Amino acid sequence: MKKILSNRKAEGYIDVAVGIIALMMVLVVTLNIYTFFMLRQDLDTVSGFLIETATSEGSFGEEFDERCEELRSSFFEFDVVASADEYYNSTYERVQLGDKMTVTVSVHTYVRGVGAFKIPVTVSTTRSGISEKYWK
């Protein structure tokens, strides 16, 4: 490195400039990967809370929606897709005891630090559980 900097030819300066630019690009990619991992961890937490609420209530009803809004105000804006293998009452989205319930939480974001380009990325996580409520 000392030889490159002490060399009076212009190619040494160009090599250093290209090296610094390459180092910055690696740093940007590393920070983006770290950000996506942290976002994924937050999504896992949110989906865990939501599936816990849904399975204990045995439905994707009013209490589930209230919990969604509470988590949106605490964390960030996210999309939720809730489904079940079989509904006991599809109007109220009730799921019978022992049936599988699934919650998918996703966030649409962009890769940052690449200049004028916007590269869209969707980060999502899925959790499932078994309904704990018996409907008569």
Range-by-range predicted roles:
Residues M1, G19, S73-F75, A84, ...:
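Extended interaction regions within the primary functional domain
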Residues K2-D65:
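Alpha-helical assembly-interface signal, strongest on the long, hydrophobic N-terminal helix that forms
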Residues I14, E63, K100, G115-F117, ...:
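Compositionally biased, intrinsically disordered low-complexity regions
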Residues G19, V28, R67, A116-P120, ...:
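Surface-exposed beta-strand edges and their flanking turn/coil or helix-capping segments
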Residues N32, Y92-R94, A116:
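Residues embedded in well-ordered secondary-structure elements
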Residues T45, F49-T104:
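Short amphipathic secondary-structure patches
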Residues S106-K136:
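Low-complexity, S/T/G/P-rich flexible repeat/linker segments used as non-globular hinges
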